[in-house]
Structure formats: structure tokens, C-alpha cells
């Protein structure tokens, strides 16, 4: 799996396209971290000390998602903690178990992904989150702005609603809203999702987990976001 994973990343990078991933454990990053430009720590791992230590040693910006209950405190604390030196159990380039020593990651930031209580991508939620970061110990992350995950709790796992969320964010960017530095979207070749089944029964390019925005719609949304960013820059 790691061999194929690295080959896919190498092929993507050869196109001049940066790659991102969600970090799940402290071992596999050693195989692919040099091919990743941005990483995420998921909502269920945001409070994990191991993932805070891992993020402190990754040579890329890392986004901590708000907790599944909507709280950003754990993510803010994680951003703060990951900025310091740590040690954690991992492997070296030869595959030997080591105690990895980190230097701290100054580029950690918050990702708003909604919650079990509803979405938090609206302008007021963004403003409040940035304000909360400023008054917390995580003064650095507040300067980086935040990323909005248009999937998960922000769209109710509905790919059509997810596309609408992206359009709403783009409109706000075009009107000059600051603080949003990135957007996440769940996209695949074929829209929607399917239940896991034997390979010969699966639709190629369709998700077997969360519903995804189809590629044609993704292409449109990326152009919409690009135009919105251009408009925001021009307004400065």
C-alpha cells in the first residue's frame, strides 16, 4: 500500500499539482511526508497528544479540525502545543524504531468542519473562531487565518449542499471577506457514493465512504473560487 501511495503522489507532483492528506498515525508519514504540501488532523484526533507531537515535526502547514461537538478549543490548544519541540515514537528512513525529536511547527491553523449541531462556515462563525483564537494561547494560528471544510458537518454529507457551500464561500471571498485562507472539498470522478462491494460490482471513480461532488462540478467550483480570490486580491 505504501509503495502504491508514494507512486500516486509522485505522479501527481509530476503534473505540478501539490498534494494534501489527513495524517492518521505517526509511522506512515515518514514514507510520504516529502511529497505532501498540506496536512490535516481530523476532528476525532484533534485532542490526541500523539497527533500534536506528530504535527510539531511535519515540514508543512497542518490544519487541526474543530471537535465533532463544534468546539474549537481543542484545535486551538493543539495548534499551540504543536508549535513547541516534542519527542514521539516513530521510524527513521531505514525503517528502524526511533524517538523522533521535533523542532515545532509554526504553521498550524484551525479547520472549521461543522459539527453534530450544524454548520460553522458562515461569516459570524468564522469571525468568532478567529476572535477566540486571538484571545486564546494560539495567537500564531489566528494570524494564519483558517480553512473551511465544506464537507462533513458543514453540508450534512450531501454533495449537492456541499457545492452550494463552496459557492457561498466564493461569494463572500469575492466581496472581500478576510480570514479564510483555504477551502476543503470532497470530490471524486463520479458524484455521490456507493456501498462497499466486490471490485467487479463497484462503479469506477465513485466514493465508498462519504458522498462526493462529481468532477465536472468540481471543475466549475474551482474556477469560481479562483475568480473569487482574484476579486478579493484586487479589492485590497
Predicted regions and their residues:
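A structural motif corresponding to the C-terminal end of an alpha-helix
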Residues: 8-17, 57-58, 105, 132-143, ...
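Loop-centered beta-sheet repeat module
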Residues: 38-93
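Hydrophobic faces of well-ordered beta-strands that scaffold small-molecule active sites
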Residues: 19-21, 62-64, 108-112, 146-148, ...
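Glycine-rich, aromatic-flanked loop segments that form ligand/cofactor-binding clefts
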Residues: 12-31, 93-94
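Short, small-residue-biased leader/transition segments that mark boundaries at the very start
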Residues: 3-4
Amino acid at each position: 500500500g505504501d509503495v502504491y501511495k508514494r507512486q500516486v503522489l509522485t505522479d501527481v507532483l509530476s503534473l505540478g499539482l501539490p498534494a494534501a492528506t489527513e495524517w492518521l498515525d505517526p509511522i506512515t508519514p515518514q514514507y510520504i511526508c516529502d511529497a505532501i504540501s498540506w496536512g490535516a488532523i481530523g476532528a476525532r484526533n484533534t485532542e490526541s497528544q500523539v497527533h500534536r507531537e506528530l504535527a510539531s515535526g511535519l515540514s508543512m502547514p497542518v490544519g487541526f479540525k474543530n471537535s465533532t461537538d463544534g468546539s474549537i478549543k481543542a484545535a486551538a490548544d493543539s495548534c499551540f502545543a504543536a508549535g513547541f519541540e516534542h519527542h514521539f515514537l516513530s521510524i527513521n528512513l531505514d525503517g528502524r524504531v526511533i524517538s523522533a525529536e521535533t523542532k515545532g511547527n509554526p504553521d498550524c491553523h484551525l479547520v472549521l468542519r461543522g459539527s453534530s449541531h450544524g454548520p460553522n462556515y458562515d461569516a459570524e462563525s468564522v469571525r468568532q473562531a478567529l476572535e477566540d483564537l486571538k484571545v486564546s494561547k494560539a495567537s500564531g494560528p489566528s494570524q494564519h487565518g483558517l480553512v473551511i471544510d465544506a464537507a462533513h458537518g458543514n453540508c450534512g454529507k450531501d454533495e449537492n449542499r456541499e457545492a452550494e457551500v463552496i459557492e457561498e464561500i466564493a461569494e463572500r471571498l469575492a466581496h472581500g471577506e478576510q480570514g479564510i485562507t483555504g477551502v476543503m472539498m470532497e470530490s471524486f470522478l463520479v458524484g455521490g457514493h456507493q456501498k462497499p462491494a466486490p471490485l467487479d460490482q463497484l462503479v469506477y471513480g465513485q466514493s465508498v465512504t462519504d458522498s462526493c461532488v462529481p468532477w465536472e462540478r468540481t471543475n466549475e467550483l474551482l474556477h469560481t473560487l479562483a475568480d473569487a480570490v482574484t476579486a478579493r486580491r484586487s479589492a485590497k
